[in-house]
């Protein structure tokens, strides 16, 4: 029986699978192959056009996996690797073969703690170092080590969406509701790092508001922007994000405060969006992908969502997002996943 490689499906896992394993699925038998081993808190993966792989480690290392060999790439700024911070996402633009450009999100250190930062750099021709690193945008620094957000995705027109968490100010903090701030927002930037969206009364580049800690973001074939974000104690959400919309945090939520207690005014408020789906109890959603590969036609358009404990597949947007299956993956015992 022919085995289909499963690597394109599993690329959003927070850890790299380290064994070659045969997996039976609804689309037939598939082979999960080892890409790398011995990684330390890998956070994101970027695929280069020739098949080389870039991996970020939260402590601040960028690794290149090429022909089975691993080496570190230098040239990154210092990162604030405390709490949930560190070196976070990486995005390889579609024009990388011509531009050599890479985008990053990371926690920038400061006297008052860390801040979510967005930057870009050029990868040297020999792929050993980053050059011309530019910091494009930085949130306010806070002593909280939580809720950096930090997912990057490229739109069809080459512009970039990025998520910024509310920075862990809690249900009583209203940073996510303030359109003049970037915390608790989705931002929309040009490839130069300038605002790609300008909404009246909003900080330049703010695309949507009212987010807690969004860590999964993807664009579907029709250009729609999909997002998953962590709730508090319950209330994780899947949202279809549109410009100028308010997604409610912390005024409305289907979760509750840690230890119990209502968040905000309840679960609904005029002028605030309802999630397409929410989870109680929490599932800790950390990645999101809509399958567009050719290897498994049956899964075209299906939604893949990674959590700390499971890898889920659901029928795609045109099928009403009904859940189909889930695949259990590695868990970190005792971790607080928010």
Go through the PLM ranges and name each one:
Residues 19-170, 216, 223-231, 281-322:
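Acidic, Gly/Ser/Thr-rich repeat motifs that build Ca2+-stabilized beta-propeller blades
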Residues 121-128, 187-196, 241-248, 315-323:
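Short loop/turn segments immediately following beta-strands, especially the blade-tip
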Residues 108, 162-183, 235-241:
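Short, conserved, GDST-rich strand-edge loop motifs in beta-rich repeat architectures
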Residues 211, 322-338:
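Conserved blade-ending motifs and adjacent loop-strand segments that build the rim/top face
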Residues 32, 69-72, 132-134, 195, ...:
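Predominantly a core beta-strand signature of beta-propeller blades
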Residues 5-15:
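Bacterial N-terminal signal peptides
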Residues 205-237, 242:
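Repeat-solenoid scaffold signature
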Residues 19-31, 125-130, 192-200, 254-271, ...:
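Blade/loop signatures of beta-propeller domains
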């Amino acid at each position: 029986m022919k085995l289909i490689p499963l690597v394109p499906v599993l690329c959003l896992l927070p850890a790299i699978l380290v064994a070659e394993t045969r997996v039976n699925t609804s689309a037939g038998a598939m082979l999960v192959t080892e890409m790398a081993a011995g990684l330390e808190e890998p956070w994101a993966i970027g695929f280069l056009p020739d098949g080389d792989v870039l991996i970020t480690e939260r402590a601040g290392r960028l690794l290149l996996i090429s022909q089975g060999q691993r080496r570190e790439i230098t040239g990154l700024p210092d990162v604030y690797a405390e709490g949930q911070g560190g070196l976070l996402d990486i995005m390889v633009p579609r024009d990388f073969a011509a531009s050599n450009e890479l985008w990053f999100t990371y926690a920038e250190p400061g006297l008052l703690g860390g801040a979510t930062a967005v930057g870009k750099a050029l990868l040297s021709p020999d792929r050993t170092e980053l050059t011309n690193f530019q910091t494009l945008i930085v949130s306010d620094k806070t002593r909280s080590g939580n809720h950096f957000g930090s997912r990057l995705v490229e739109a069809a027109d080459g512009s970039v969406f990025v998520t910024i968490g509310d920075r862990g100010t809690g249900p009583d903090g209203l940073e996510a509701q303030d359109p003049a701030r970037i915390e608790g927002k989705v931002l929309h930037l040009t490839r130069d790092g300038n605002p790609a969206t300008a909404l009246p009364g909003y900080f330049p580049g703010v695309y949507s508001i009212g987010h807690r800690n969004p860590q999964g973001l993807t664009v579907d074939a029709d250009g729609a922007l999909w997002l998953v974000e962590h709730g508090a104690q319950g209330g994780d959400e899947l949202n279809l994000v549109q410009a100028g919309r308010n997604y409610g945090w912390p005024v409305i939520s289907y979760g509750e405060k840690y230890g119990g207690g209502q968040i905000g005014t309840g679960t609904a408020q005029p002028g605030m969006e309802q999630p397409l789906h929410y989870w109680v109890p929490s599932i800790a959603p950390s990645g999101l992908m809509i399958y567009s590969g050719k290897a498994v036609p049956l899964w075209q358009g299906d939604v893949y969502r990674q959590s700390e404990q499971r890898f889920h597949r659901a029928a795609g947007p045109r099928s009403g997002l009904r859940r189909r299956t889930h695949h259990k993956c590695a868990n970190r015992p005792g971790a607080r996943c928010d």
